[in-house]
């Protein structure tokens, strides 16, 4: 059936009978709104009766009929223009002695099915002309039927209340058509705008217009509020779950949010063996792309080839080019800002101390501020390494996506990290951080991308050096604490091998014996916050096969955790400490050889570079270091 609308002309009366009554629920019109074409006022209808016309859908419409005109006969079937049949029923309305019939604008009329419709008088020009259907009645009268939207009787109730509260409503299982919701909201907004005076009991916008609300209550659904403020984008849809109270701008967003309380995930992945379910269709669509590999959202920035599964991921990535950080920390005196709201949320926990993710492994007891760090930590216990390098012949596996992404750069010449000060690009985020500290005095931490696109060029990769091998195996980062321990060292068939190893073995770096001889054995570890941790040369000297444990020393001289250096038949790698002089310069530990030379790494061990300026790759840095030590002068980009 069609949505009723309450309208009036400038002369129309706006008071409903019983104006002082309590706020009431009014079932929305079950009849079609009929406007008489001649526009006669409904007052002083001497000798006039209402003619009930039963439409084909079973609803009843009342039309004005002069009793002197006998063209309409009780029980007569009228063929309407759309081909449907209407049945005429004559309903005489008795008059009080000496009084004329007064049907006031806005008056409630009780229909035969027990529902209530409102009499209204208005010009048809006030309606959307595309929604009006002209019906020629047999008495020559033209009536206009206003088609708004089909509203099922059992599903929809319009509750209009001045106090903005709803009580005594029964929930139902019916699903409401979004078009119905939209029509109801538009209707309430129209009444809010058109109404200038009204009785408080009806909840129409009246004298205290700014203080009143109009609520649209759908059975089985949360309260929806429509008022003038709604048009300006105010968050008017409130979550009614205990302790929540979050506000949303649309009913749809509220409904999606409520699934976080109910656990409802109606959208299930149909990919064989998957079975994951999601709260939104968009979430499912994005997930399916992990199976298909589709990444339709491509960055348009020059020299950037990244693509993403969702437009949201692309938007986050674009901020790495623009430097935009729209999400500011709310704590006074902090001043940090972030590219995503989720990163800000995790950051805020550094102020509050909240760590809601607890490891359930017996005897562990660790807790984390972010779900990502928690999941990565759990994989230490399970041994799971779900992220596999897809470059042919590599097959390295990683516990976290970011480690896989960082690993990818060893196979290509991609430099995904750019300096927002000067525009220089780098393969490793740690090298970018070091550049910003040394060149621009910028100590602001850099957010690492959790999702990024990488597509290695076909057949392209770094050449693997022959000969002895140094393997640096990365550690696992869990929040701000890094666990660096000795793992297993295996013989790879090479005659000489050095392994600097920590708990989560992943990244391998190949190096020739000539390069090892040129490099020496001084290593500086640089933590994520820029603090240099030096492994002293006299402790790091390897003179024979065996394992040597040395303590990492902070810049202030405080001893830290133990790092193991394992050597096998490395007499050629030995350099006596007496033959090397060292001096501390800025963040670099340099030798007194021809050129300054330092190996550096982040505290979680995911990147190593030679500090010869700004080297992006460990293998490239080692090659350049070797050539410099041998008297050559290669450029940084060689």
From Swiss-Prot:
The keyword Transcription applies. Signal peptide: none annotated. It comes from the Eukaryota. PROSITE patterns: ZINC_FINGER_C2H2_1, ZINC_FINGER_C2H2_2. The modification Phosphothreonine is found at residue 352. InterPro entries: Znf_C2H2_sf (IPR036236), Znf_C2H2_type (IPR013087). Expressed in all tissues tested, with the strongest expression in ovary. Gene3D superfamilies: Classic Zinc Finger. Pfam families: zf-C2H2. The modification N-acetylmethionine is found at residue 1. There is a cross-link at residues 213, 406 (Glycyl lysine isopeptide (Lys-Gly) (interchain with G-Cter in SUMO2)). Keywords: Acetylation, Activator, DNA-binding, Isopeptide bond, Metal-binding, Nucleus, Phosphoprotein, Repeat, Transcription, Transcription regulation, Ubl conjugation, Zinc, Zinc-finger. One of its GO terms (cellular component) is nucleoplasm. It is found in: Nucleus. SUPFAM superfamilies: beta-beta-alpha zinc fingers. Its main location: nucleus. GO terms for biological process: positive regulation of snRNA transcription by RNA polymerase II; positive regulation of transcription by RNA polymerase II; positive regulation of transcription by RNA polymerase III; regulation of DNA-templated transcription; regulation of transcription by RNA polymerase II; regulation of transcription by RNA polymerase III. A zinc finger (C2H2-type) spans 237-261, 267-291, 297-321, 327-351, 357-381, 387-411, 417-440. One of its GO terms (molecular function) is zinc ion binding. Interacts with CHD8. Forms a complex with HCFC1 and ZNF143. PANTHER family: KRUEPPEL-LIKE TRANSCRIPTION FACTOR, KRUPPEL-LIKE FACTOR 15. Belongs to the GLI C2H2-type zinc-finger protein family. Transcriptional activator. Activates the gene for selenocysteine tRNA (tRNAsec). Binds to the SPH motif of small nuclear RNA (snRNA) gene promoters. Participates in efficient U6 RNA polymerase III transcription via its interaction with CHD8. In complex with HCFC1 and ZNF143, regulates the expression of several genes, including AP2S1, ESCO2, OPHN1, RBL1, UBXN8 and ZNF32. This is Zinc finger protein 143. It comes from Homo sapiens (Human). The lineage of its organism: Eukaryota, Metazoa, Chordata, Craniata, Vertebrata.
């Amino acid at each position: 059936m069609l949505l009723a609308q309450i309208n009036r002309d400038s002369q129309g009366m706006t008071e409903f009978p019983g104006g002082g009554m309590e706020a009431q629920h009014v079932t929305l019109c079950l009849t079609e709104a009929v406007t008489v074409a001649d526009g006669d006022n409904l007052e002083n209808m001497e000798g006039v009766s209402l003619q009930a016309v039963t439409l084909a859908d079973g609803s009843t419409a009342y039309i004005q009929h002069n009793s002197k005109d006998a063209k309409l006969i009780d029980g007569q079937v009228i063929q309407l223009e759309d081909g449907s049949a209407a049945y005429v029923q004559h309903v005489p309305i008795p008059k009080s002695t000496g009084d004329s019939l007064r049907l006031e604008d806005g008056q409630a009329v009780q229909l035969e099915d027990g529902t209530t419709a409102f009499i209204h008088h208005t010009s048809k020009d006030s309606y959307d002309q595309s929604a009006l259907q002209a019906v020629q009645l047999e008495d020559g009268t033209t009536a206009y039927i206003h088609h708004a939207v089909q509203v099922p009787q059992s599903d929809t109730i319009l509750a209009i209340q001045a106090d903005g509260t709803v009580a005594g409503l029964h929930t139902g299982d019916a699903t409401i058509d979004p078009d119905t919701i939209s029509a109801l909201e538009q209707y309430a907004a129209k009444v809010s705008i058109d109404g200038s005076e009204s009785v408080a009991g009806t909840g129409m916008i009246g004298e205290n217009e700014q203080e009143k609300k109009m609520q649209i209550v759908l059975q089985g659904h949360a309260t929806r509020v429509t008022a003038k403020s709604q048009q300006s984008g105010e968050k008017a849809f409130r979550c009614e779950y205990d302790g929540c109270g979050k506000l949303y701008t649309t009913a749809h967003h509220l409904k999606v949010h409520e699934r976080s309380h109910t656990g409802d995930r109606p959208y299930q992945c149909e990919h064989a063996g998957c079975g994951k379910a999601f709260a939104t269709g968009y979430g499912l669509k994005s997930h399916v792309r992990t199976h298909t590999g589709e990444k339709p959202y491509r960055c348009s920035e020059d020299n950037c080839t990244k693509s993403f599964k969702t437009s949201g991921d692309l938007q986050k990535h674009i901020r790495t080019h623009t430097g935009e950080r729209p999400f500011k920390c709310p704590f006074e005196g902090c001043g940090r800002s972030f590219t995503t709201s989720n990163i800000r949320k995790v950051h805020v926990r550094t102020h509050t101390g909240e760590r809601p993710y607890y490891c359930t492994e017996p005897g562990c007891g660790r807790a984390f501020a972010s779900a990502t760090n928690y999941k990565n930590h759990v994989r230490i216990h399970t041994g799971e390494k779900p992220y596999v390098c897809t470059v042919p012949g590599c097959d390295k596996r990683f516990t976290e996506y970011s480690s896989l992404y960082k690993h990818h750069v060893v196979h290509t010449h991609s430099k995904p990290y750019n300096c927002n000060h000067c525009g220089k690009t780098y393969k490793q985020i740690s090298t970018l951080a070091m550049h910003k500290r040394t060149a621009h005095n910028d100590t602001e931490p850099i957010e690492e991308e959790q999702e990024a696109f990488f597509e290695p060029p076909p057949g392209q990769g770094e050449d693997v050096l022959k000969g002895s091998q140094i393997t640096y195996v990365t550690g696992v980062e869990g929040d701000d604490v890094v666990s660096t321990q000795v793992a297993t060292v295996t013989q790879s068939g090479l005659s000489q091998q050095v392994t600097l190893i920590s708990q989560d073995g992943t990244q391998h770096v190949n190096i020739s014996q000539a390069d090892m001889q040129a490099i020496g054995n001084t290593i500086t570890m640089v933590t994520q916050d820029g603090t240099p941790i030096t492994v002293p040369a006299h402790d790091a000297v390897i003179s024979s096969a065996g394992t040597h444990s040395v303590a990492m020393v902070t810049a202030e001289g405080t001893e830290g955790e133990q790092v193991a250096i394992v050597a096998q038949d490395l007499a050629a790698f030995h350099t006596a400490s007496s033959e090397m002089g060292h001096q501390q310069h800025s963040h670099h530990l340099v030798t007194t050889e021809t050129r300054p030379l330092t190996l550096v790494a982040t505290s979680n061990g995911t990147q190593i570079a030679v500090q010869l300026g700004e080297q992006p790759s460990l293998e490239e840095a080692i090659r350049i270091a070797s050539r410099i030590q041998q008297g050559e002068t290669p450029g940084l980009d060689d």
